[in-house]
């Protein structure tokens, strides 16, 4: 029996958070292009080791390899900001700084999915997807 996921991005973040709490090496997440782009940012920022697309064209999954330092997860927290029922947008001037720059905000912009630093550099605002620290 499959379950209906109303917020796939939040589901992905919770799966990662739960897997790091249990010190799992990998976590499987149902595939979507947006999740793949978000994971690419998380990887580039050094919060996960790697991820790969697995499965056939009908049932694809993202296999995320989590990153640990001295047996402690590199990801200490995640927070979903913009939700399906309440979208949160920000102009470039009002983009948040997560933990004074120690974390990242993931922003969905007209130029693609970017970190808060990249969005400031590109001078674009957008939908604040999540915070990771």
Swiss-Prot record:
A single Gene Ontology biological process assigned to it is: translation
Alphabetized PROSITE patterns for the sequence: RIBOSOMAL_S8
Q: Which InterPro entries match?
A: Ribosomal_uS8, Ribosomal_uS8_CS, Ribosomal_uS8_sf
For this UniProt record, the keywords arranged alphabetically read as follows: Ribonucleoprotein, Ribosomal protein, RNA-binding, rRNA-binding
So what does this one do? Answer: One of the primary rRNA binding proteins, it binds directly to 16S rRNA central domain where it helps coordinate assembly of the platform of the 30S subunit.
Q: Output one GO MF annotation.
A: rRNA binding
UniProt key word Ribonucleoprotein: yes
Please indicate which superkingdom the organism of origin belongs to.
Bacteria
What is one term from the GO cellular component aspect held by the record?
Answer: ribosome
Its protein name is Small ribosomal subunit protein uS8
Classification via HAMAP family: Ribosomal_uS8_B (MF_01302_B)
How is the subunit organization of this protein annotated in UniProt? Part of the 30S ribosomal subunit. Contacts proteins S5 and S12.
Family, as annotated: Belongs to the universal ribosomal protein uS8 family.
Q: Per its UniProt record, what Pfam families does this chain match?
A: Ribosomal_S8
Record bears the keyword Transferase: no
Matches recorded under SUPFAM superfamilies = Ribosomal protein S8
């Amino acid at each position: 029996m499959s379950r209906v996921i109303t917020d796939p991005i939040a589901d992905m973040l919770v799966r990662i958070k739960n897997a790091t709490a249990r010190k799992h090496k990998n976590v499987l997440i149902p595939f979507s292009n947006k999740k793949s782009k978000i994971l690419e940012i998380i990887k580039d920022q050094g919060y996960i080791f790697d991820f790969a697309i697995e499965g056939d064209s009908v049932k694809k999954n993202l296999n995320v390899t989590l990153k640990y330092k001295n047996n402690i997860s590199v990801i200490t927290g995640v927070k979903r900001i913009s939700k399906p029922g309440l979208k949160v947008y920000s102009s470039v001037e009002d983009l948040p700084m997560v933990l004074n720059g120690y974390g990242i905000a993931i922003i969905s912009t007209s130029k693609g999915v970017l970190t808060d630093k990249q969005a400031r550099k590109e001078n674009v605002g957008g939908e604040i997807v999540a915070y990771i620290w």
